[in-house]
């Protein structure tokens, strides 16, 4: 599946101040095929296994 990686706090992985390879590395860590820093704000990953938690507007709990 594709989507934004989320941490234990339910927030998207921020990449604003990270090196250019940060998101690709984080995505491969969870067995994703590739990833990038979307609009310099959050890591978006491709071809991840279904067990990986991704951000969803309906179930968003970041900051709550």
Curated annotation (Swiss-Prot):
- Which key words tag this protein in UniProt? Antibiotic, Antimicrobial, Cytolysis, Disulfide bond, Hemolysis, Ion channel impairing toxin, Neurotoxin, Secreted, Toxin, Voltage-gated sodium channel impairing toxin
Pfam families, per this entry? Toxin_3 (PF00537)
Tell me one GO molecular function of this protein. toxin activity
What GO terms in the biological process aspect are recorded for it? defense response to bacterium; killing of cells of another organism
The record, for InterPro entries, names: LCN-type_CS_alpha_beta_dom (IPR044062), Scorpion_toxin-like (IPR003614), Scorpion_toxin-like_sf (IPR036574), Scorpion_toxinL (IPR018218), Scorpion_toxinL/defensin (IPR002061)
Cited Gene3D superfamilies: Knottin, scorpion toxin-like (3.30.30.10)
Which tissue types show expression of this protein? Expressed by the venom gland.
What does the entry's free-text domain comment contain? Answer: Has the structural arrangement of an alpha-helix connected to antiparallel beta-sheets by disulfide bonds (CS-alpha/beta).
- Protein name, please? Bactridin-2
């Amino acid at each position: 599946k594709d989507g934004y990686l989320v941490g234990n706090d339910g927030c998207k992985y921020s990449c604003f101040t990270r090196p250019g390879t940060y998101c690709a590395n984080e995505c491969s860590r969870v067995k994703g095929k590739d990833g990038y820093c979307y609009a310099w704000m959050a890591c978006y990953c491709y071809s991840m296994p279904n067990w990986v938690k991704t951000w969803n507007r309906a179930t968003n709990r970041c900051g709550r």
